[in-house]
């Protein structure tokens, strides 16, 4: 019996599933739109929406929680500085899923998962800028030592 069992297994172990969700959420935060299978998109949406809700708090505890979940400080920085202020007035519903037909090889249902109210022209430029800033700070720290 499946009583009180929530979520999808997606034919993965728990650690594999959590790693996949973390990697997909970093990609979604970076590009603000990704193409994946429909079951993965349906599983990813509540994961990322909870991250945005935590990022809206904006304190140190929230930052540490986000780093523990997605393990990418640059993505956490974009969550805290760009996405949290963008959705400050919105209470949930930060992400939409658009069905995108079927994949040729195995006819798996595909979907686009994207942020609502996203800037279509940016295409990950903010993420690259944050990444370059982090890289420059690291180089400066190495040169000072």
Curated annotation (Swiss-Prot):
InterPro entries: Ribosomal_bL17, Ribosomal_bL17_CS, Ribosomal_bL17_sf
GO BP: any one term: translation
UniProt xrefs under Pfam families: Ribosomal_L17
Gene source species: Orientia tsutsugamushi (strain Boryong) (Rickettsia tsutsugamushi)
SUPFAM superfamilies according to UniProt: Prokaryotic ribosomal protein L17
Keywords, sorted A to Z: Ribonucleoprotein, Ribosomal protein
One function term, GO molecular function aspect: structural constituent of ribosome
Gene designation per UniProt: rplQ
Entry GO terms, CC: cytosolic large ribosomal subunit
Family: Belongs to the bacterial ribosomal protein bL17 family.
Record has Hydrolase as a keyword: no
Description of how the protein assembles with itself and partners: Part of the 50S ribosomal subunit. Contacts protein L32.
Lineage, broadest ranks: Bacteria, Pseudomonadati, Pseudomonadota, Alphaproteobacteria, Rickettsiales
Keyword Ribosomal protein assigned: yes
Protein name per UniProt: Large ribosomal subunit protein bL17
